[in-house]
Each structure stands twice: as C-alpha cells, then as structure tokens.
C-alpha cells in the first residue's frame, strides 16, 4: 500500500494488546514490521534481523486509532462557539461570506488536524471537507499534500450535495424571510456533476486501498441531496469500490425533517432507495428507531458514534448497546474541531464509554472501555472497507500502531491497560506512532515535519484571519434568528413513538 515495501523495523520488548480481541497477557513481545505489514510477533528477545530497532520497554503497544469523521475546514474555528444546537451552530461554520484562504493556508489548516491526530494516537482519519462555492483543485491538492507530508493515513471526502443549505430544513417558508431565503438559494455552489467527477478523477491515483492518502465518497446528508443525486453518489461508490459516509439523524429536528421530506425517518428512507450497504457509515445516527437499527444490521452499514460532538451540541446519545445487540458495526469519530474544540480520539474513546452509562439503569449493558477501543480501531477499519486488515496487532495486518509510555502516572499502578488508556490517557504519554510501517513519531517527536515552525506560521497568519472569521460570523445573525424558530418548532413536533430517547428530559 506504499513505497515502504522492503524496510524491516523491529519493535522490541513491548507489552501489547494483541489480535482482534486486543488480548493482554503482560508478557513483553518483539514485533517485526516488514514494509507496511506486521510480519512477526514473538516473545521478547527472539527476533533480530532488521534495518531499524526501537526498544519499547515501558511502553504499551496498541493499534492506531481510526477517526471516522472530522472536518478539516473547521480547524481555524476551534473554540469559537459554545452552547448552540447543531442547526444554529452550523451557520457559523458555513457563513454567507466565507473567509478566503490561500492554498498555503488550507495546507496549514489541514495540518492542525493531522498533527493533533498523530499526537493523540490516531493513525487513520476521515476528512469530510467542504468544497465551498466552487471546486478549487489547487486548494484541494494543498489539503491532500498536508496529509502526505504529515505521514498520517487519510481518506478525504467532499461533503457533496445538490440542494441549497436553506432548503435542508422544514418550516422555511414560515420562518425565513423571503428575501433572505432567495439570497441563500442564489449562493454559488459546485454543479452536482462536477462534484462526482472530482471524486472519480482523484480516485484514479488516490484510491484508499492503494494510497495512504486517498478519497472516499461523501453525501453530506439525505436532506441536502435530491434522490437522483443520492443514487448517483451510490453508483459512483459502487463503481469505484469506495467507502461512503453521510450524516444521518444527528438531531431530533432531523427526524422531523425526514418525516416531512420523505414520509419516514431518514435511515428508513436510505434503506428504501438502496443506499445502505457495507462500507457505508451513517455519521452520528443518534435518533434511531428499532426498524432503522434492523436495516443497518441487515445491510451491513455502519453506525458511527461521535459522542463528544453530540454532547457539546446537545444532540443526544446514540443507542450503542441496541446497535451492538443487533450486530451493527459501530465505529467512532471526533467530528470537526469547531464543534468539539479537539479531534483527540482518546477523548472520544473515553466519552463514548462514559456517556453510555446514562442510558438506562442496567449497568451490565453500559459500554465498556474495551468495547470503546474496539469501536475506535478494528470497527473503524471495517467501516472504511479494510475488513480486518486495519486496527489490529496481528501477523499480516497493516502496520498502523502506536505505543504509550507506561512509566507515567496514567499507568501507575498498572492495573488494567485498556481502562487506563481509554479513561485517562489523552496523548501526553505517546512515544511512538507508525503508519503503513513508517515511523512518524519517535521519542515523542514528529519525524516528517517541523511541528514548531508550522504552528508558529499558523499563529502568524491567524492574526489577520481571526477578525475575518468574526466578521463572517456577525453577518449570520439574521440567519441564526430564523433558524432558531425552525429549531424550536422542530422540538415541538412529534416523532415516531418507538424512537429511542437520545436526550434526558
């Protein structure tokens, strides 16, 4: 999967979470990496021949985390919002007058997420980035180059849609002034055919099964796409054997929207039109009913849990146990850093396990730390079409892995490595990261880029960009006022009585 086909790296003396079950027996191991694959795992002191040897004594070796959802176009907006539900918040990200960035600034913005991801144990990310008013290949190439340079595995999608944002909502005629609605509908956006052609063109050289930095197919959300466009998106993914992502029922209003737009909740609609298939991830999938969960299980689609984002936006808590009971693959994502402030996947693991404990009194059904780690590794690889090749430390698997120091307060005393990793480690103890068999962090230092210089350049540029973001946000106040009314009407509207309650009353 990369040009690292002959190099042999030996990781010595590491305690590891081994196999698809991530079993831990406490005994140190040697692990031989050949090219981009794990070639051998043996008792410590029994493997020798290698080009590069790294001693991982006092480290815990873990599969690299898979972040199934982030938005690189938000990285310059982290920390700018709080205490807004999704429907209001999103209009501060997609403003009427977008801040125009140079290709270099797009590169730097993308690099923020790549650096934070690598520093917190993530080796694979999905970037669902926005195209904006027009397709700009120079800026798209800049984002892809950032991932190339950082050394992370990235699958990039382009949040495709063919409807104006204002028409994603119900009750528009009632609450949005006609002149404002007309202005929003007239905003420039890429032609549907051009969006599909972009993915088809990029996939020739950047297919995720053959390129560390590849593309996938992103339909932004069912309510943002006409049915013919969704069918075209599905056909494109099938033709190219690419994974698919789409936002589905993140909020209660979106359940109401599905009922009004399609005559049923959105997962039922996607099932009806044949959109649900394996390697198709429904992002968020918070507000679900039993029929929708059955559809996910029957079709092999993935429900992706974004717990930290769903908490900060007040969206709700996904019914993870019900999904797992039905046999649905559940993966994890951070979402964008404007809503979450961070793309730290260790934070996502901990919040996924912790927030499940608010769903019901039957404590045996709460999500465990081990289940959260599985969702953030092997299940994430399965969601993206890698089968069992990504997210597991076993012979033959892709060598995407990380090691955390265990001679730290986080792991002292050393009782349960998975619980201490999921609930306490947040990246400070990361000593090693390897992607596709290449060491990208060693001794806590990023090996492929000058991190300090990049962060300094970002801060220097943002001194000018910050006021532009503030002005763009201020311009959205009339839109926020209208959407506030739509949001409140949606809260009052009924949803199917068997929908799992996602919020505390």
Residue ranges, per PLM feature:
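Active-site microenvironment of metallo-dependent hydrolases
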Residues: 1-29, 34, 374-505
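Metal-coordinating catalytic core of metallo-dependent amide/deamination hydrolases
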Residues: 138-285
């Amino acid at each position: 999967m990369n040009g690292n086909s002959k190099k042999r790296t030996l990781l010595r003396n590491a305690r590891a979470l081994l196999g698809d079950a991530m079993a831990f027996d406490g005994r140190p191991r040697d692990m031989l990496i050949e090219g981009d694959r794990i070639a051998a795992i043996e008792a410590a002191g029994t493997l020798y021949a290698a080009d590069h040897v790294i001693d991982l004594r006092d480290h815990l070796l873990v599969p690299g985390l898979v972040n199934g959802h982030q938005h690189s176009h938000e990285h310059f907006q982290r920390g700018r919002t709080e205490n807004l539900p999704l429907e209001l918040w999103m209009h501060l990200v997609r403003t009427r007058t977008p801040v125009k960035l140079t290709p270099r600034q797009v590169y730097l913005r993308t690099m923020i997420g790549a650096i934070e991801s690598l520093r917190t144990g993530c080796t694979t990310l999905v970037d669902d980035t926005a195209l904006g008013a027009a397709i700009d290949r120079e800026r798209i190439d800049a984002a892809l180059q950032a991932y190339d340079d950082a050394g992370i595995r990235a699958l990039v999608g382009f949040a495709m849609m063919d409807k104006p944002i204002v028409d994603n909502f119900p009750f528009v005629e009632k609450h949005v002034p006609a002149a404002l609605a007309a202005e929003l509908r007239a905003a420039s956006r890429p032609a549907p055919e051009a969006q599909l052609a972009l993915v088809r063109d990029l996939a020739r050289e950047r297919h995720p099964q053959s390129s560390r930095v590849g593309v996938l197919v992103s339909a932004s959300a069912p309510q943002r796409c006409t049915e013919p466009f969704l069918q075209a998106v599905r056909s494109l993914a099938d033709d190219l054997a690419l994974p698919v992502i789409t936002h589905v029922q993140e909020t209660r209003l979106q359940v109401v929207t599905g009922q009004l737009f399609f005559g049923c909740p959105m997962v039922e609609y996607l099932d009806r039109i044949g959109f649900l298939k394996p390697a198709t991830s429904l992002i968020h999938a918070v507000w679900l009913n039993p029929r929708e969960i059955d559809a996910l299980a029957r079709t092999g689609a993935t429900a992706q849990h974004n717990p930290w984002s769903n908490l900060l936006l007040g969206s709700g808590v996904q019914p993870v146990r019900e999904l797992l009971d039905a046999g649905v693959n559940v993966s994890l994502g951070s979402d964008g850093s404007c809503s979450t402030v961070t793309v730290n996947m260790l934070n996502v693991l901990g919040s996924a396990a912790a927030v499940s404990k608010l769903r019901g009194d039957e404590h045996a059904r709460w999500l465990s730390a081990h289940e959260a780690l599985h969702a953030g590794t092997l299940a994430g690889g399965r969601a993206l079409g890698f089968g069992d090749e990504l997210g597991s430390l076993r012979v033959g698997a892709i060598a995407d892995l990380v090691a955390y120091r265990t001679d730290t307060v986080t792991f002292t005393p050393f009782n349960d490595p998975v619980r201490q990793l999921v609930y306490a480690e947040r990246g400070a103890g990361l000593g090693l990261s390897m992607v596709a068999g290449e060491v990208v962090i060693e001794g806590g230092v990023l090996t492929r880029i000058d991190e300090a210089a990049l962060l300094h350049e970002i801060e220097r540029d943002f001194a000018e960009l910050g006021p532009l973001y503030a002005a763009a946000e201020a311009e959205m106040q009339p839109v926020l006022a209208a959407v506030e009314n739509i949001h409140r009407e949606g809260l009052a509207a009924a949803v199917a009585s068997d929908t799992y309650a996602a919020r505390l009353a």
